[in-house]
Structures are given as C-alpha cells and as structure tokens.
C-alpha cells in the first residue's frame, strides 16, 4: 500500500511550515488510472463530492423530467445559503406541495458570510432550507414522490437510499464496505479514491441519448457547468474554479478534504483526498491538477487565489503562501 504524498505546502518566509499530504487519481474514460499520487486504493468517504451520484437515480428514473438545469445544479450543490439558493430551493419545494418541515437535513446558519451576517443582523433563525444540502434533499423528495415512498427518505433502508447505494456501487464499480451518516443525515458510502475517479470519468465519457444513465449524467454535469453559482457560491473553490476553466469542467468539493472533477471534453475524471481534512489543501490540490491538465491558466486570479494563496497577518503584511508541493507543481 502506497503512503500519502505531500501535495500542498504552507510557507512562512523562507521555510515550509506545514504540509498537506494526500491521495489523488486522474482516470480515463475506461476508468483506468492515467496518473496517481499516493494510494489509489485508499478507502475514503467522498462526502458531498458524491452528490452527483446521489442525484443520479432521480434523473435516471424520469422523476426529474420536468426539472430545470438550475434545479439539477442545486441537487448537486453544497450551497452558501444565500437568497439566490434558498429562494430557488423553496420554490422547488412549493412546486411539490411541500415545505421546510418535510426536509430531514436539519437547519444551520448559511455557509456564505454575507447571508450569515445578514441573518445575525436581523435576528432571523435559520431554517432547513439554509442547510447547504437542501437542494440535494429537494432532489431526494422529488424521487420519493415519484416512487410513492415514505417520508423518512434519509433512512438507509428507504427506497431512495437503496437506489443511491446501487448507483454508487455501479458507477464506482466497487462494492461499498460500509457507510457513515453525513452532516445532512443521509448515508455516505465508502469507496476507494480510484473508485471515485472512475465514477467521475464515467460522467465525463457519458453520451447524451446513449441510454437513460448516460443521459442523466450529461444533464447533471451540464447543469453544474451552466450554473456554477448555484453549486457553491461566490468565493468558494467549486464556483470560482468552474468559472475560470477554459473549457467545461464540473467540480465538487466534499467535507474533510475531498474534491472531484469531471472533464467531459477529455473524458477524464479526477478524485483527491487530503488526509488531514483541510479544505485549503484540497482547494490548492484540485486547482493544481486543473493547471497540470491545461484547463486552468495558472495566472488566472482564481487559480492564484486557491493554488498560490498569499497569507497575510492582521496588519496586512505578507507572511507566507499556500502552494502546490513538487509532486503537483
């Protein structure tokens, strides 16, 4: 078993102060590894990076036939909880005759600083629609209604979650050894880094009209690329890097240092895990891989922000930087 390799370095002055190590793969349209760092067989929980897979049964089944690209993007989102996100998810719920109480994700303050500060200023209490996963849960409820299934759609034995597990194992081409309960209360199934890279490559290679699954995959990544602002929000790596890429690339972060990318024009899928769970490490690593693949200009402001981020102190003095390690440079 290969060990994790240094992927991102934190420099203070002339010294490397900290290192984020991890595992990563780039897979081709057949799922074969084109390039790897660390251990491709490392077992991981993909967390929110698996949302495109969790949305797959909804689209593939026909339940999403009348959904807009915005709704599909939100079904894959870890959104900021800004008004542009919550208004659209609330409208989606209203279309189904449902309300905030029908969610099972739980409430939390918006992830986006502006939306969070506004709620604090006005004394507003967060609802479940402010949960960054509320779009995914609206998707689960869409599939629940299509199936005629019960209200407790987060239960691992619920038909919705069984469909998600089946899709997950089919696209990763692995039997999941188990799951953990994610922050939004649904099962998050384990696989290898290679498995997630293989799954993303399948999305990248999918052809619209080939079959229901491939058509669903194309609809999902196209929605993400068309609406990067809905997948995360201003200032977030997913959104800013999708906007910056020179060709369509779908990006999705996951908690605890996970990130995936779908590159449809190249038939490539990327998956990476920073083992200490640091988002700054995962953001830098994915930006570095995108530069390496030639789809992100290293001089683009978004690339510099996440790949070569300047560290400043409270007096705005530059004290160091975040940058890719030699393995990714």
What role is predicted for each listed range?
Residues 60-66, 97-101, 147-152, 158-178, ...:
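Bacterial peptidoglycan biogenesis and beta-lactam-recognition machinery
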Residues 1, 69-176:
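Active-site-adjacent helix/loop patches that line small-molecule binding or acyl-intermediate pockets
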Residues 1-41:
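Beta-lactamase-like hydrolase cores
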Residues 13-16, 130, 248-252:
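Short Gly/Pro-enriched turn/cap motifs at secondary-structure boundaries
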Residues 203-329:
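Structured C-terminal helix/loop/strand segments within mature extracytoplasmic catalytic/sensor domains
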Residues 37-45, 75-79, 122-131, 181-187, ...:
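A short glycine/serine-rich beta->alpha loop
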Residues 19-24, 138, 165, 256-259:
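Short glycine-rich loop/turn motifs
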Residues 46-63:
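Active-site SXXK
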């Amino acid at each position: 078993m290969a060990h994790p390799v240094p992927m991102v370095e934190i420099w203070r002055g002339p010294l490397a102060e900290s290192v984020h190590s991890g595992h990563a793969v780039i897979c081709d349209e057949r799922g074969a590894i084109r390039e790897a760092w660390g251990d491709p067989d490392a077992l991981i929980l993909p967390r929110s990076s698996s949302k495109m897979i969790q949305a797959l049964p909804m689209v593939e089944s026909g339940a999403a036939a009348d959904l807009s690209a915005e709704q599909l993007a939100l079904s894959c989102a870890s959104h900021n909880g800004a008004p542009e996100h919550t208004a659209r998810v609330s409208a989606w719920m209203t279309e189904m005759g449902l309300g905030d109480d029908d969610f099972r994700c739980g409430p939390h303050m918006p992830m986006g600083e502006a939306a969070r500060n506004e709620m604090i200023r006005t004394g507003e209490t967060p609802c479940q629609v402010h949960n960054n996963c509320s779009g995914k849960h609206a998707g689960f409820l869409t599939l629940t209604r299509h199936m005629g299934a019960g209200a407790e759609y987060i239960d691992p034995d619920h038909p919705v979650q069984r469909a998600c597990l089946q899709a997950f194992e089919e696209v990763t081409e692995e039997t999941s050894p188990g799951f953990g309960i994610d922050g939004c209360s649904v099962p998050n199934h384990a696989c290898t880094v290679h498995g997630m890279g293989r799954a993303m490559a399948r999305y990248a290679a999918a052809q619209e009209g080939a079959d229901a699954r491939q058509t669903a995959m194309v609809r999902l990544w196209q929605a993400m690329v068309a609406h990067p602002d809905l997948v995360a929000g201003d200032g977030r790596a997913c959104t800013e890097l999708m906007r910056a890429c020179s060709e369509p690339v779908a990006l999705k972060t996951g908690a605890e240092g996970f990130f995936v990318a779908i590159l449809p024009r190249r038939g490539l899928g990327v998956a990476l895990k920073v083992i200490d769970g640091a988002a700054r490490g995962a953001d830098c690593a994915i930006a570095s891989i995108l530069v390496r693949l030639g789809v992100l200009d290293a001089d683009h402001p978004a690339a510099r922000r996440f790949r070569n981020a300047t560290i400043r102190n409270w007096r705005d003095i530059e004290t160091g930087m975040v940058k890719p390690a030699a393995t990714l440079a």
